[in-house]
């Protein structure tokens, strides 16, 4: 291992920009039925499948951290579900502990004293500059991040902090900052409506984390998870199924913090390979989101379920608009495949043609 690469993401970080080519005016349920009766597959795909092939709107990654200075060789990674603390070890010796603070957008990396000289660097995703044309990708592999034209990031190297500030579009900017304090490394990724606000919030978060210190942050973090796991438990004769239940509840908590975007698919849905995320990281309003949240009441976690319900409730205007445009009727109905703002994205007919999926 030359260095440890850490992917950093923000649940609601999207490039919302819509292409100039809007959805066809015949993107309606009535037209879909008409074409189905005619057996016109080509026209059906043109109207309903083609929009999904465009690179935007899409979920985007926030960036990477690189940690250099640890011994070379093989490592073992593990996650303690009870405390939500990850460990990175070599030959039985823990080389790194990591956790994401519940309730605040701060990550903490804790090193042994012997590796206090390890170096941390930050890397922006490989967004494009507008020179690369859209690729002929598919829903699973939509193509390179180079298709996305984003302005250059502003670098930060002051007050012991390193990172960058990135404008995404007219509505969104974000900051990825980190700071090394001895054997502890703090990092944060914050989204806001402009660079100035994102920068201000990120610096406040890092300063507050440094003032509190890693040990107190870890105590606070463990206390939160202890209370969370104390609300329900499960014992099954099948250990694999039992672990599946606990993992599902871990994802439910980790991906459903109040005030943030809910999970589209069992957690943050993004790629870490300089590619657009599979299925654009979008919201499939079918079993994909239903299975993620359907158990929140039986597991006694209403606060996490409320994150998803509040999100859907906020999209009621878009739901009414889609009901009129697609079905030609009053009421409220969200697309079964949508962006973070509730806009229809298209996709294969199995996802958009059945009213019961919406």
What residue spans do the PLM features occupy?
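Aromatic-residue-lined binding/catalytic grooves and analogous aromatic/hydrophobic interfacial grooves
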Residues: 1-347
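Residue-level detector of conserved catalytic or cofactor/ligand-binding positions
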Residues: 347-358
């Amino acid at each position: 291992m030359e260095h440890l690469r850490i992917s950093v993401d923000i649940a609601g970080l999207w490039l919302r920009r819509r292409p100039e080519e809007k959805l066809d005016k015949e993107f309606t349920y009535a037209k879909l039925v008409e074409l189905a009766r005619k057996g016109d597959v080509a026209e059906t795909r043109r109207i309903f499948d083609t929009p999904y092939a465009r690179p935007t709107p899409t979920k985007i990654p926030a960036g990477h951290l690189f940690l250099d200075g640890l011994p070379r060789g093989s490592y073992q990674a593990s996650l303690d579900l009870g405390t939500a603390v990850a460990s990175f070890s070599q030959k039985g010796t823990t080389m790194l502990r990591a956790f994401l603070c519940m309730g605040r957008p701060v990550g903490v990396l804790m090193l042994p004293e012997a590796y206090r000289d390890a170096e941390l660097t930050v890397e922006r995703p490989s967004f494009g500059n507008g020179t690369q044309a859209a690729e002929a990708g598919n829903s699973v592999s939509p193509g390179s991040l180079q298709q996305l034209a984003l302005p250059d990031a502003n670098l930060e190297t002051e007050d012991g902090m390193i990172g960058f500030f990135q404008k995404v579009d007219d509505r969104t900017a974000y900051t990825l900052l980190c700071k090394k304090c001895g054997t502890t490394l703090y990092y944060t990724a914050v989204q806001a409506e402009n660079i100035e606000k994102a920068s201000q919030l990120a610096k406040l978060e890092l300063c507050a984390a440094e003032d509190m210190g890693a040990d107190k942050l870890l105590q606070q973090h463990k206390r939160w998870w202890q209370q969370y796991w104390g609300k329900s438990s499960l014992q099954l004769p099948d250990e694999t199924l039992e672990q599946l239940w606990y993992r599902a509840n871990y994802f439910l908590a980790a991906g459903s913090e109040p005030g943030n975007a809910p999970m589209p698919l069992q957690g943050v849905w993004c790629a870490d390979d300089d590619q657009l995320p599979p299925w654009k990281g979008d919201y499939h309003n079918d079993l994909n989101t239903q299975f993620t949240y359907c158990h929140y009441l039986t597991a006694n976690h209403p606060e996490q379920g409320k994150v998803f319900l509040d999100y859907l409730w906020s999209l009621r205007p878009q739901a009414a608009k889609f009901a009129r445009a697609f079905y030609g009727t009053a009421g409220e109905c969200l697309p079964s495949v949508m962006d973070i703002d509730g806009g229809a994205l298209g996709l294969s007919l199995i996802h958009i043609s059945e009213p019961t999926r919406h």
